[in-house]
Amino acid sequence: MITKFLPPWSVARWRSLAAGAVACLLAACGPSRSAFTESGQGSYYADKFAGRPTASGAPYRPGQLTAAHNSLPFGTRIRVTNVRTGRSVKVVVNDRGPHVKGRIVDVSKRAAAKIGLLDAGVAPVRLRVIRAAPGRR
């Protein structure tokens, strides 16, 4: 056994290092924040909001691929899929909302066009976090 050849303080150090390595490995393999998914109704911003500041401070730009979500941190990249069409788009959360009961996300006009949401205005969607931004959810 290797402990016969090492001083007691050295054995304790190696055990501490091994325990730390195991803890880091378990933390890295644990559940990821990017596993967040949500299903519900999605809609898109009205044209009247163009140029107005979002909750993050950036102005709303209809031509960008952005979204509003009530709890995901700003900067989080999510995939929004229109359940009816099967089409999806990647967007960045930069606003809070939607402020309508029963809705889980508002997307920009460009994002809405990509997933076939413009005509319907509201449709069932599925969200999946691609890359979580640092911060609270």
Feature locations, PLM:
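Secreted/periplasmic proteins
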Residues: 2-18, 22-137
